[in-house]
């Protein structure tokens, strides 16, 4: 049977509200007939139609879309055997740049001047009366701060932290709520607005009021009546405002304080507010944060001070939900931590200044509470103020609404646990933006983390909306001289803005590497076109610092090491200054990589002159690396793992010395007892550098090593996510790290070294795209260690790839499901290749 299995608008299967004038419509197909191909797809949107004969998406290019309108979408597909299939969906246009009738409002009497804390949440209220039958009603809302909307006491929508985290000086999202069925005729519309990222304390300096001096609200209720008339009720000076709501404190780091006995009083008129910024206000285009998995505690303990400790057996980003019978005035506190002290109490040392505490003052009777304006990174929760026997408690995971589209499993259960840790690390740090960690006073959009992790992330999740949203901010935050800030959105931490033409290797590389990873996973040119000028400016800034040398030194990146991260958190040296001291190697390899990748992108976009220019630049940088930083015979002048990994993976060594360089890397690995020695730049690539250069056995010995530092050491000592530091806990469960110049930079939920996940999919499982978007892909497992079988799925624009292999009795059995519209090259152990069209196949060969 020929079927349409997926039909999306702007990557959403349902519920899309967009301001895009040319929304993208995507689809995937399935068939039980081998070799099935799409012959024609007729796409109809309203009165417009077009035909698609290749690819899996098309942009709407019909008559201008009207605002506030629902459009039907219909797809009629025909395969090459004449079978047909039909699917329908719909989307809604938002405001489409319609001027707002509502005005920004705030409380001018609230003067928020305290440092390093967040403001008291504001509550806005409007009584609304309607007296005619309603055909359709939509609420459009946004804020400076983070908000929740209620209609007659009922929360609207499922999103946490609306309107989301963006580069507020450039972009601000608004949300759309269908309230047609909720309006009664006499209604109360209420908003609670906390400080969030725009006004509240943020970054490790706890800077506040970065974007606005106080919270502000912009909203419109647009009602279409049955008689054809329309009424718009917008925010203005007739709205009421108060700071006496039940949410007494809300801070992204410190947590939330809620007083259920608090009656909202002191209502007074709001007033128009003039913002310090003028962002483009656009319908949601990212992936909003929502509640996902709910976990119950697996163990309950009592700390020495009497605090009840709950173990949820999983480190995560989220909140607790408590339910109990309380008395008015009773105070319950919930603290959060990733690890315990030896005495069983919560270890909150590594939260630094983040208090990560929820405080709840009870009313009489049964009650349920869960924070709405903060989140924490935790495995353990400590509760005081209520007896354990009287309390029901759950941990609720919060992360962006991204589809979990990939899976990996093999015969080694420790690797399966590593895969789980990687995906939980991703979910914990996909909280509206890609963050570094979810627990301490940071949770920032560090560019280096997602730069190295994005290929792994895209094997596990469908991230088009999530990453495209963040990349808009990368583009917006780029410095005039080309550098990319280390954290995006900047929001109070602007390094390297202080340096002319400043660029930071591997961190700034995110502007090239993340779009490239997204293109490889999806085949979409949109992100490459959007980011191409940004990439060009960035590579130019990198070249500025590489241009100070003379002769063969000209293409060596010469920025002082203190302005780099270098071989960040490499476990073979103990100090931050030592990681940074390796920057000449990491930065020069970075420039080779970004310029080489930019050459590929230029070619894809049809910019042939640019492609030739960047390809030549990449070659010159590679030559300089080998001339200046090696002896010319495959040995680096300073020997450490990353110094070999990067040029091997990036193919920088001449062919006649590559094998020698790989042997030298193997010697370092063997000398280190197959333990990892790379920092952020080298860790994603070390297993590829070994396996793809004839040393798969060494790669597997490193992958399967259980001694510290290694991926499976973390698994062996009980990790449930990936750590920032390889030696975060010793065999006794205690942190052995002393003063290393990083100010207690120890996180147990940091996905960067989980970038090894790409190796699990590409080499252990063996699925890798050979053409962007997996239109063509190969299934070529690299067998090693004691692994006897592996299976997994990979989500693609064409459908789901399913692949599995198993070795038994000297024979290898390989099975693969190839989506309609794609082609798979199966590589057998003998290196023989079989090219397969769509369908399901089983191939056997001598192992």
Question: Across the structure, where does each feature detected by a protein language model lie?
Answer:
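Extracellular/oxidizing-compartment recognition motifs
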Residues: 1-440, 448, 465-468, 481, ...
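Active-site-proximal structural scaffolding
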Residues: 84, 121, 142, 170-172, ...
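Alpha-helical support elements that line or immediately flank enzyme active sites
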Residues: 137-141, 151, 319-338, 373, ...
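Active-site acid/base region of carbohydrate-active enzymes
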Residues: 146, 236-238, 242, 390-421, ...
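C-terminal capping/lid segments that line or modulate ligand- or cofactor-binding pockets
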Residues: 189, 258, 441-442, 447, ...
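Non-catalytic C-terminal accessory modules of carbohydrate-active enzymes
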Residues: 209, 213-220, 232-263, 282-293, ...
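Hydrophobic residues embedded in beta-strands of well-ordered beta-sheets
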Residues: 230, 308, 367, 636, ...
């Amino acid at each position: 049977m020929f079927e349409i299995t997926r039909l999306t608008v702007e990557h959403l299967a349902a519920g899309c509200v967009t301001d895009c004038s040319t929304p993208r419509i995507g689809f995937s197909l399935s068939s039980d007939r081998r070799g099935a191909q799409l012959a024609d797809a007729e796409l109809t949107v309203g009165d417009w139609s077009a035909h698609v004969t290749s690819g899996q998406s098309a942009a709407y290019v019909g008559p201008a879309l009207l605002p506030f309108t629902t459009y039907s979408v219909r797809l009629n597909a025909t395969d090459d055997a004449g079978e047909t299939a039909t699917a329908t969906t719909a989307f809604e246009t938002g405001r489409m740049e319609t001027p707002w009738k509502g005005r920004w409002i705030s409380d001018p009497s609230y003067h928020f001047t305290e440092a390093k804390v967040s403001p008291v949440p504001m509550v806005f209220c409007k009584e609304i009366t309607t007296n005619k039958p309603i055909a359709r009603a939509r609420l459009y809302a946004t804020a400076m701060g983070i908000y929740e909307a209620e209609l007659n006491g009922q929360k609207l929508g499922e999103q946490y932290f609306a309107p989301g985290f963006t580069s507020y000086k450039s972009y601000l999202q608004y949300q759309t709520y269908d309230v047609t069925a909720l309006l009664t005729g006499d209604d109360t519309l209420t908003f609670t607005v906390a400080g969030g990222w725009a006004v509240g304390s943020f970054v490790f300096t706890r800077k506040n009021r970065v974007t606005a001096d106080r919270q502000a609200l912009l909203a419109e209720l647009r009602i279409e009546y049955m008689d054809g008339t329309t009424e718009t009720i917008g925010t203005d000076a007739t709205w009421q405002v108060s700071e006496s709501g039940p949410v007494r404190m809300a801070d992204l780091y410190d947590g939330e304080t809620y007083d259920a006995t608090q009656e909202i009083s002191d209502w007074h008129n709001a007033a128009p507010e003039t913002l310090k910024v003028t962002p483009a206000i656009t319908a949601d285009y990212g992936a909003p944060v929502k509640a996902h998995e709910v976990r119950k505690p697996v163990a309950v303990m009592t700390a020495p001070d009497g605090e009840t400790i709950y173990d949820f057996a999983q480190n995560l980003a989220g909140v607790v939900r408590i339910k109990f019978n309380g008395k008015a005035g009773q105070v319950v506190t919930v603290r959060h931590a990733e690890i315990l002290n030896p005495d069983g109490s919560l270890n909150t040392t590594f939260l630094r200044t983040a208090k990560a505490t929820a405080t709840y003052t009870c009313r009489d009777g049964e009650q349920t509470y869960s924070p709405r304006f903060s989140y924490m990174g935790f495995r353990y929760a400590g509760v005081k103020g209520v007896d354990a026997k009287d309390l029901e408690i759950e941990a609720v995971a919060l992360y962006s609404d991204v589809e979990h589209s990939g899976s990996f499993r093999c015969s080694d259960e420790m690797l399966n646990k590593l895969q789980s840790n990687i995906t939980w690390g991703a979910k914990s740090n996909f909280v509206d933006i890609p963050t570094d960690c979810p627990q301490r006073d940071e949770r920032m959009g560090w560019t280096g983390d997602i730069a190295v992790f994005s290929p792994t992330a895209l094997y596990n999740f469908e991230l088009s909306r999530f990453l495209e949203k963040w990349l808009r901010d990368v583009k917006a935050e780029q410095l005039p001289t080309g550098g990319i800030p280390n954290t995006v959105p900047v929001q109070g931490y602007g390094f390297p803005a202080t340096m002319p033409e400043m660029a930071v290797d591997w961190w700034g590389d995110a502007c090239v590497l993340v779009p490239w990873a997204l293109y490889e996973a999806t085949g979409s040119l949109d992100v490459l076109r959007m980011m191409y000028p940004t990439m060009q400016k960035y590579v130019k800034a990198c070249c500025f610092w590489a241009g100070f040398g003379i002769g063969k030194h000209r293409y060596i990146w010469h920025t002082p090491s203190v302005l780099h991260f270098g071989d960040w958190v490499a476990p073979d040296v103990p100090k931050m200054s030592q990681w940074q001291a390796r920057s000449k190697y990491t930065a020069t390899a970075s420039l080779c990589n970004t310029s080489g990748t930019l050459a590929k992108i230029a070619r894809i976009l049809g910019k042939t002159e640019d492609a030739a220019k960047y390809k030549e630049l990449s070659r010159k940088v590679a030559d300089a690396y080998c001339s200046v930083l090696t002896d010319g015979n495959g040995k680096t002048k300073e020997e450490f793992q990353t110094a070999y990994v990067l040029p091997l993976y990036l193919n920088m060594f001449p062919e006649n010395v590559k094998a020698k360089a790989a042997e030298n890397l193997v010697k370092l690995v063997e000398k280190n007892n197959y333990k990892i020695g790379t920092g952020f730049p080298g860790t994603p690539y070390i297993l590829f550098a070994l396996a793809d250069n004839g040393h798969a056995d060494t790669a597997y010995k490193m992958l399967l090593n259980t001694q510290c530092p290694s991926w499976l050491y973390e698994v062996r000592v009980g990790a449930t996510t990936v750590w920032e530091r390889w030696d975060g806990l010793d065999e006794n469960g205690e942190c052995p790290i002393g003063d290393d110049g990083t100010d207690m930079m120890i996180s147990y939920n940091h996905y960067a070294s989980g970038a090894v996940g790409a190796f699990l999919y590409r080499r252990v499982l063996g699925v890798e795209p050979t053409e962007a978007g997996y239109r063509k892909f190969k299934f070529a497992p690299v067998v090693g260690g004691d692994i006897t079988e592996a299976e997994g799925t990979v989500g693609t624009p064409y459908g789901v790839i399913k692949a599995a292999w198993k070795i038994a009795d000297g024979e290898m059995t390989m099975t693969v499901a190839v989506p309609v519209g794609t082609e798979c090259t199966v590589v057998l152990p003998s290196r023989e290749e079989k090219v397969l069209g769509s369908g399901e196949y089983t191939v056997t060969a001598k192992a």
